[in-house]
A protein has these predicted regions:
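Glycine-rich phosphate- or other oxyanion-binding loops that anchor nucleotides, phosphorylated ligands
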Residues: 1-52, 56-62, 67-92
């Protein structure tokens, strides 16, 4: 559990932004989850969220950020996320 800071994207954050967000208490930064949750809420749906942290923030890794890294990590996480949601949803 932690604090998720949502941005509109579509660009990765800069190291300066990450530093500021960290000082503000953000544990994770992302471009998805919140917009989808807002639309679902506006439609009257109950909303919950589970996120996959797909990459280290700008300035936190030895290599530059890339969409390929995000996609690869998401693919690797898919089986575990599927299992988690399959077990969780019947309990809601």
């Amino acid at each position: 559990m932690g604090t998720y800071l949502a941005l509109s994207g579509p660009a990765f954050e800069t190291p300066a932004e990450i530093s500021t967000f960290s000082k503000l208490g953000a544990d994770a930064v992302g471009m998805s989850t919140v917009p989808e949750a807002m639309v679902a809420n506006a439609l009257g749906l109950k909303v919950g969220a589970v996120s996959c942290i797909s990459n280290l923030a700008a300035g936190k890794s030895a290599h530059p950020l890339s969409h390929e890294e995000v996609a690869e990590t998401a693919s690797k996480a898919l089986p575990k996320m599927t299992k988690l949601l399959a077990n969780l949803l019947p309990k809601l």
